[in-house]
Amino acid sequence: MNIKLTNIILSFILVVVFLKGEEAQISLDNLDAFFLKGVDNKIYTKTDFNGENGNLIVFLSNHCKISQLFQISLISNYEKWKNNGIKLFCISPNYELSILPDELAYSNLGDSFQEMKLRAIEQKYNFPFLYDGEKQVLTNQLNVKITPCAFLFDKFDRLIYFGKIGDIDKLNTFQNSVLSQKIEALIDGKNLKFSRTKLYGTRVKFEKDIKIAQDVAYRYSREKIRISFTDERRLNFFIEQKTDYPKLFYFWTMNDNEELNRENLITISKYFKIFRKRGFKVFTVCVGEEEKKDEMVEVLEKAQLSAINLYTSGTELTKASHLRPPIGNFTTPFTRLVSGSGAKLYGTVGAVNAIMLRNSILQSLNDADHRQ
C-alpha cells in the first residue's frame, strides 16, 4: 500500500479511536507541560487548570462563525460555573499565517493574539482566553481538529465529555445541551462516564498548512489588473444598479498623497480578497486622463487590487458627487460603501479606517444574507 495513503488511514483511525473509545479517555494530569499566554498577558500552565469540581477547556476561533454563536452562552454561564468549582478556559488554536483570506469572511477579526485581545474587549469576555496558535502545544496534545469543541474534565482530571458546545439551532436552550447537563452533574457531585457528541465548525489551521496559504497568495499576486474608461452614464449604472450584496467605491487621483493612496488601496484589496466570495464588489475610479493609464495600473498592481477598476475625467463625476461624504477640505481620495439597495453606509474622505470599514462590510453582508 502507498506509504502516504497508509499514513492518512492511520491518522484517521487515531482520530476515530480518540473520539469514540471510552478507553481513549485522557487525563489532565497526563498532559505534557504547556505555557499559554492569555489576553490578560498572564501565562497559564497546567497547574492553573485546578477547578474544585472540574475543568472545561473550549477551543474557539475568532474567525469561526460557529464559535461566535456560542460566545454568549460561555460568558453568561462563566460566573455560575466558577462559583460552583468548574473552571473555564477558552483557547485559540489556529496558526494565523495558514488561514486563507476568504476563511475570514464571517468575522470582523482574525486569529492573531492582538485580535484575540480585541475580541475579548468587544464581547466582554469574563473568562481566560489563551493563545496556542504559535506552537499549538495543547492543540496537538488534545488532537483538536475543529472549532468550537469542548473538553470537560471531572475533579479527578478524567475526561468525561468531548464534543460540541451546543446545537446551533437551539442557541436559546443551551441549558438543555449535553455539555450543560454534564457540568450540572459535576457540580452535583455525580460520577460520570465518558461521552461524546458530533462536532461541526471550522477546521483548525496548522503550521503545515502554510504552503496552501502561500500558494493562494501567489495566485492572488498573479491576477490580471485591468482598468477601463468609463463615462458618466456607465459610472451611474454601476452606482445605481440594485444588487443583493454591498459594493464599495473608491475615488482617487494620481495627484493624491502617494502613501495615503497606497495604504487605502492595500486595505481595500485585503477586504476584497476576504469578502468577494460572499458577493462583495469593489469599484475603483481614478480621475485622470488616458495618458496616465499605465501609471494607474502600476499603482493598482502594487496593491494587487483586481477589482472593477475604472478611470474617467473630472467632468464625468457629476452623478457620483453625492457619494462623497461632506467632510474634509479636499476632493479625493474618498471611499463609500453602498448597500445592495443603494443605501449609503461607511464613507470617508482621506484615510480609510480599516476597522470601521471591515465592520460595515461584514454587517452589510450579514444583513443581505438574512434577506435571502
Where are these regions (language model features)?
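Non-globular targeting/processing and membrane-anchoring segments
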Residues: 22-55, 164-247, 360-372
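N-terminal, post-signal-peptide region of Sec/Tat-exported proteins
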Residues: 36, 42-89
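Conserved helix-turn-beta segment immediately C-terminal to the redox Cys motif
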Residues: 69-92, 245-246, 262-286, 301
